Amino acid sequence: MTSETVDPPQLNTIRIEVDGEIGTLTLDRPDAFNAMSPEMIGELTVAFAWLADRAPLRALIVTGAGRAFCAGGDVTWFRKGVEEEGIDLPSEVRRGAEVLHQAIVDLRRIPYPVIAAVNGPAAGAGFSLALACDFRIASSTAFFAPAYGRIGASPDGGMTYFLPRVVGPSRALELLLEDPNLKAEEARALGLVSEVVGADELM
């Protein structure tokens, strides 16, 4: 890691702020509930790689702008791409998943604690991103949803790796099959979050 002072990269869908030894990464597509577009997924790899190389930092907070943590993959973007641009959906989804998986690997390489401050819905890939953090603190307005079954997809973003390690294999399978919306207190009871706080106390 380098200890030199370098300004964070300027990205379109993500904000990185550094305050002393604490970094904050904010998913910044509030109008889309911070859903992951291909651009955001690519920028996550840039952001996490930069953060992993910052020696002065001692902790990183990952959160979302507005009312959501992250609504998962941007299904609206994919639908529009198919209808208006004729993209090959299976190929685009596969490519996006590969980049997302690299972003999760880059996140796990960060050599200091990463805390997910879950300020609202964390669904699909957003749930996966929260699980990939070292631990999670949730707003009382947050909820967690696997969501993949609702679109006929298998979980990605590391969910099948992290979820069984957090809640146990049997409960993880139950959550993936039943696909509930877990309220913050329910998530705490399962061990998914360490603490639930008021919305005005989270950040």
Go through the PLM ranges and name each one.
Residues 64-103, 122, 150-152:
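Glycine- (often His-adjacent) and acidic-residue-rich active-site loop
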Residues 40-43, 96-99, 202:
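Hydrophobic alpha-helical membrane-association signature
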Residues 24, 59, 68, 135, ...:
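Residues at the N-termini of beta-strands
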Residues 25, 62, 74, 129-130, ...:
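Hydrophobic/aromatic residues within transmembrane alpha-helices
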Residues 105-203:
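Crotonase-fold acyl-CoA enzyme core
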Residues 1-65, 105:
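Conserved CoA-thioester-binding segment of acyl-CoA-metabolizing enzymes
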Residues 28, 73, 119:
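Histidine-centered beta-alpha loop that forms part of the nucleotide-sugar donor binding/catalytic region
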